[in-house]
Amino acid sequence: SPKKYDVIHSMEVLYYLEDPSKIIKKISDSWLNDGGRLIVGLDHYYENKDSHSWEEDVGTPMLMLKAKEWVRIFEMAGLEEVESWHANKSADWAGTLVITGKK
């Protein structure tokens, strides 16, 4: 069986996937130790209006979800103690959406 981990981190990756719920479920089911934690950082999300043009700007498909939709994906994957917050938020930046959940 594959090696399992206590912490898995992803930064600026999941919105490039057509269906990120599949990999989040795989991480939860197969890659995390019991009690392990998934931590994800995203700058491309609905509440970050500055990111709305990115897909067109760079010519790459990007999935646009609301923060609560990302949280729901974590919960549907079986992760517990799911939390989210906006890191490095400022007057002119919505911040990085950070979501974490525990197996």
Language-model region placement:
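Short conserved loop adjoining the S-adenosyl-L-methionine
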Residues: S1-K3
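A conserved beta-strand element that flanks and buttresses the S-adenosyl-L-methionine
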Residues: H9
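Short catalytic micro-motifs in class I SAM-dependent methyltransferases
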Residues: E12-V13
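A short, conserved alpha-helix within the catalytic core of class I
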Residues: Y16-I27
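Conserved beta-strand signature within the Rossmann-like core of class I S-adenosyl-L-methionine
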Residues: G35-D43
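Short, glycine-/aromatic-enriched active-site segment of Class I SAM-dependent methyltransferases
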Residues: D43-M62
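Short alpha-helix
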Residues: P61-G78
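Core SAM-dependent methyltransferase catalytic element
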Residues: A77-L79, E83-K103
